[in-house]
């Protein structure tokens, strides 16, 4: 949600109206977050404090809930040693996955809680045969615009290095999170949804995961991605928007907007098309050559 709905303690302009449009039109929606620390109830309170009301815990799906769903679906009798905070502990408890500090079958890693003592115990449990599961692959998570802290991915990588065992990473971009989200949306709509739109600000997680799950992938430029870097990726978003505010009228009217509808736009909203070995930008009929960006492999 950070970078799509809010930045730090401020709503992105137009985000409140966007959410209001979803609610007033009865459009099924779900907020996905890789942050395993908060509970859905925490997120309801946070967004209400920022100025968005009318939300309920059912509107949020965290990587902690995703990990709990995965374990209860694939290994319902498992136990877990948890490195994480309230959101992860609550999600596992709701799914009747016991917290075991003696002989766990899983070490589950989320955000926070990675003390020297806990890391030492986790190392021992993994060496004894426990499987390592991370709620998400993020190496860091934001605390403020100037401060970050280690994420679940960093803690899992530490344990991978110390034990020589590989972790399984859930959360975005893992398809399991997107398929579970689609299922939840279909349940809310009381029918199987043929088309689902994922709106996100990160190419590596939001856009990649949505594409691999067969969803429409809308990239917003209100967060971490700069337009200049979009062409570096093999996969491309379905649409690029300045922010979620560009979607509000479409949701209200049910009619697609002509604005920002091509595969790629530059940072000013001008159409960018691919011509052979170079990119060109169309600005009022004037074509300015752009160097071809390097493609990732």
Map each language-model feature to its residues.
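Residue immediately C-terminal to the conserved phosphorylatable aspartate in receiver
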Residues: 1
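Short, intrinsically disordered C-terminal tails of secreted or membrane-associated proteins
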Residues: 293-296
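Asp-based, Mg2+/Mn2+-dependent phosphohydrolase catalytic module
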Residues: 4-27, 36-61, 68-272, 279-281
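A generic structured-segment signal
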Residues: 167, 288-291
């Amino acid at each position: 949600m950070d970078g799509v709905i809010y930045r730090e303690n401020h709503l992105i302009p137009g985000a409140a109206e966007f959410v209001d449009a979803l609610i007033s039109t009865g459009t099924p929606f779900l907020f996905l977050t890789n942050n395993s620390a908060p509970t859905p109830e925490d997120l309801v309170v946070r967004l209400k404090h920022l100025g968005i009301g009318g939300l309920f815990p059912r509107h949020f799906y965290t990587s902690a809930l995703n990990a709990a769903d995965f374990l209860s679906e694939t290994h319902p009798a498992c136990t877990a040693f948890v490195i994480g905070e309230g959101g992860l502990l609550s999600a596992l408890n709701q799914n009747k996955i016991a917290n075991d500090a003696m002989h766990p079958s899983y070490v589950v890693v989320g955000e926070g809680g990675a003390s020297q003592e806990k890391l030492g115990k986790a190392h021992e449990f993994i060496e004894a045969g426990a499987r390592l599961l991370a709620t998400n692959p993020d190496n860091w998570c934001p605390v403020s615009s100037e401060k970050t802290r280690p994420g679940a991915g960093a803690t899992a990588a530490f344990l991978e290095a110390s034990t020589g065992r590989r972790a399984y990473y859930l959360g975005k971009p893992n398809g399991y999170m997107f398929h579970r989200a689609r299922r939840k949306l279909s349940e809310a709509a009381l029918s199987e949804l043929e088309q689902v739109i994922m709106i996100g600000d990160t190419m590596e997680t939001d856009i990649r995961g949505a594409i691999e799950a067969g969803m429409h992938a809308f990239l917003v430029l209100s967060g971490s991605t700069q337009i200049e870097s979009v062409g570096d990726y093999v996969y491309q978003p379905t649409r690029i928007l300045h922010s979620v505010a560009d979607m509000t009228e479409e949701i209200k009217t049910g009619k697609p907007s002509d604005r920002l509808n091509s595969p790629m736009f530059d940072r000013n909203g001008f159409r960018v098309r691919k011509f052979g070995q170079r990119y060109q930008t169309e600005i009022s009929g004037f074509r300015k050559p752009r160097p071809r960006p390097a493609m990732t492999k």
